Amino acid sequence: MMFGMSASLMAQTAEPQHVSPFVESHVASIPSVPTQDISRPARQQGSIETLTYTAHRRGKTMTKRAQVYVPYGYKAKDKKVKYDVLYLMHGGGDNTTSFLTPPRNWFALRDVLDHLIEEGRMRPILVVCPTFYDDDQNIGANRMEDATAMTREFHTELQNDLIPVVETKYNTYLKGTDSLAVTRSRDHRAFGGFSMGALTTWYQLAYGVNAVRTYIPLSGDIWVYDAQGKKQDARTSAEWINGMLEKSPFAHDFQVYGYTGTKDIAGNPMKAVVEALGQYAPLFRYRTPDANLYFAMRENGEHFYGHINEYLYLALPIIFKP
């Protein structure tokens, strides 16, 4: 018996043949990003809100929080204007604040979003940053085995607990709160993550493709273990996730935009698994005119949020075209 494990929308999706050069379906280079300009606050700034919801896992009921980026110009009373939602998961040992309001000296994702939206390079969206841990203090995940289990199981919490709360509180495309309503609105939803958040992303694709159409794994490959706990190679990982997707009616209706760096600890493993997906996983179309798998690497890119937010600066205008 094997199970997958990985390292740590949208109203309209960009057609594969129209993607920008830096994310063509081969190992493309990522151009430089004007980080100094982006790090300055935009004139039109979105807001950061904290959302509380009730989550369930393994028989436990708990209160959890997520940070929500609400774009400039959002009007709660204007029900005619609806927004796509990006769910973005942090890396191991981090929390709900790591993307949008990081306590470090690199530019925050909120500034990236503000500038892209203000400049008209992407349409306004909601961005939700939850945690796979029980809370922001990493309670319940003192061991790596516990943390990886949480990432593997998060797809259930996303569909049953988080999406219904987020997407009924804000003006989105969700109509109802049951699983059918979530599935019907999947085209307006994306999921991404960094490091162990990429682990969560690959798991979401494998187990919950019915709820989300577009995926953004950032510096994280797919891990598969055998019954003895031995990590399998990239080919086995690719075949595993392909087999999981074959069980879904949405096996031919998803897109993956992957990014990493040449100096990232997850760089070569992620490159290997992407190439294996293209070779051994028929549901993943890579290096083809109708590609649904895209991958790019940043020269000297390392395993930290500063570079991850650069990848998002480049990816989001493709996925959330204005």
Question: Where does each model-flagged region fall?
Answer:
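Sec-dependent N-terminal signal peptides of Gram-positive bacterial secreted proteins and lipoproteins
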Residues: M1-M5
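Non-catalytic cap/lid and distal C-terminal segments of serine-dependent acyl enzymes
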Residues: Q12-P322
